[in-house]
Amino acid sequence: GVDTLELEVGYGLVRLVGGDLLDRIAMIRHQLASELGLVMPPVRIRDNMQLPPDRYRLKIRGATIDEGEVHPELLMAMDSGLAAGKLEGIPGVEPAFGLDATWIDPALRMRAETQNSTVVDPTSVIATHLTEVVRRHADELLTREEVGNLVEQLKQSAARLVEEVVPAQ
């Protein structure tokens, strides 16, 4: 079967997956469950040798929803709107919100933060992008099975309501 939610990574990003990305995804699932009441489906992560090494792709039921690029050895500095001065690095785009960004050497982190840039690691970039894709496509992730689970949970606290609204089978 096709996975509901999938993250494909280029070979340059494989070691990020082995790092704290899995922990971050677990935190996102917890956060979205309390925020949206939606239990995010498990994320299938696979490497895709057809992708350029630093690119990743987010898919829902096999359809590509969005892509992004991160530099695993660098940090992303985003202009908070108040940034003073230009940072040396590789120009880029923060993929979740489309903000201009610069990929900088980790040694420049303090300077970037002193100049009012927001600095994040590549794992955070992917995690934030995934979170926003799930938020924007929550309706597509709400399966019949998921609705059934929500109804079962509701039976615990509001059995009468469920009896009135859901036809007996």
PLM feature spans:
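Membrane-embedded alpha-helical signal segments
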Residues: 1-169
